[in-house]
């Protein structure tokens, strides 16, 4: 298989959600283009970028969507979540309010996205450790309680950015491939594929055969 961008085995849509200013756009640009913009302004509307990675010899193309966390853009919610198989729920470790709003974002995600979506809680801007307002253990406990994976990242110095996307994409791939194997097994076990002939021995009597069925 070549390395062209249009050659892939799986295409996974992953959305970035969270308050405005937590660094979603820089996480996107750092992972897909290895770029960081210190003067990055809030995203207006929606944008997405792609990058392909290898998992178990398969090419996974990630289509990562980013939208503004500002309330006035929430009208795009339904289209934004449609088809998403993964979500990074991002907060700023130096701004406790962005962490407090995680619960609301999680509810919105579960209201609009597929029930099987894979969710990772991401504490971004870990380089601001001297300004930390959200303890790591507190966020990790919240993630465990709500069935989310958890990681802290820094788009500025690239800490754990690769790991965050690799982890969620690998988890999605495992779920999808296991489902495909399960579906294949079910198909193999279906009656049409497992027809067992039943041989009825002939009767010794010369009675005429009954051609109809009778309810008892």
Curated annotation (Swiss-Prot):
Gene3D superfamilies: P-loop containing nucleotide triphosphate hydrolases. The small GTPases Rab are key regulators of intracellular membrane trafficking, from the formation of transport vesicles to their fusion with membranes. Rabs cycle between an inactive GDP-bound form and an active GTP-bound form that is able to recruit to membranes different set of downstream effectors directly responsible for vesicle formation, movement, tethering and fusion. The small Rab GTPase RAB11A regulates endocytic recycling. This is Ras-related protein Rab-11A. It is a lipid-anchor. It is found in: Cell membrane; Endosome membrane; Recycling endosome membrane; Cleavage furrow. Keywords: Acetylation, Cell cycle, Cell membrane, Cytoplasmic vesicle, Endosome, Golgi apparatus, GTP-binding, Hydrolase, Lipoprotein, Magnesium, Membrane, Metal-binding, Methylation, Nucleotide-binding, Prenylation, Protein transport, Transport. The modification N-acetylglycine is found at residue 2. GO terms for cellular component: cleavage furrow; endocytic vesicle membrane; Golgi apparatus; Golgi membrane; phagocytic vesicle; postsynaptic recycling endosome; recycling endosome; recycling endosome membrane. GTP binds at residues 20-26, 37-38, 40, 42-43, 69, 124-125, 127, 155-156. Switch 1, switch 2 and the interswitch regions are characteristic of Rab GTPases and mediate the interactions with Rab downstream effectors. The switch regions undergo conformational changes upon nucleotide binding which drives interaction with specific sets of effector proteins, with most effectors only binding to GTP-bound Rab. A lipid is attached at residues 212-213 (S-geranylgeranyl cysteine). It holds the Pfam family Ras. Residues 214-216 form a propeptide. NCBIfam families: small_GTP (TIGR00231). Its main location: membrane. A motif (Switch 1) lies at residues 36-47. The modification Cysteine methyl ester is found at residue 213. One of its GO terms (biological process) is protein localization to cilium. Its EC number is 3.6.5.2. It catalyses: GTP + H2O = GDP + phosphate + H(+). A motif (Switch 2) lies at residues 67-86. SMART domains: RAB, RAN, RAS, RHO. Mg(2+) binds at residues 25, 43, 66. Belongs to the small GTPase superfamily. Rab family. Its cofactor is Mg(2+). Regulated by guanine nucleotide exchange factors (GEFs) which promote the exchange of bound GDP for free GTP. Regulated by GTPase activating proteins (GAPs) which increase the GTP hydrolysis activity. Inhibited by GDP dissociation inhibitors (GDIs) which prevent Rab-GDP dissociation.
């Amino acid at each position: 298989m070549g390395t062209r961008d249009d050659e892939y085995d799986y295409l996974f849509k992953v959305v970035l959600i969270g308050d405005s200013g937590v660094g979603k756009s820089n996480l996107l640009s750092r992972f897909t283009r290895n770029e960081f913009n210190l003067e990055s302004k809030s995203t207006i509307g929606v944008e997405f970028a792609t990058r392909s990675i290898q998992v178990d010899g398969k090419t996974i193309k990630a289509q990562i969507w980013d939208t503004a966390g500002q309330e006035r853009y929430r009208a795009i919610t339904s289209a934004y979540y449609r088809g998403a198989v993964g979500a990074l729920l991002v907060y700023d470790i130096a701004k406790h309010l962005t962490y407090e709003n995680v619960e609301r974002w999680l509810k919105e995600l579960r209201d609009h996205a597929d029930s099987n979506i894979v969710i990772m809680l991401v504490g971004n801007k870990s380089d601001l450790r001297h300004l930390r307002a959200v303890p790591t253990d507190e966020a990790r406990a919240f993630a465990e309680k709500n069935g989310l994976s958890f990681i802290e990242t820094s788009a500025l110095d690239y800490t754990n950015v690769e790991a965050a996307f690799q982890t969620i994409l690998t988890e999605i791939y495992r779920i999808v491939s296991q489902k495909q194997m399960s579906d294949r097994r079910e198909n193999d076990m279906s009656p049409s594929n497992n027809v067992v002939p039943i041989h009825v021995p002939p009767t010794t009597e010369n009675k005429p055969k009954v051609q109809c069925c009778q309810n008892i």
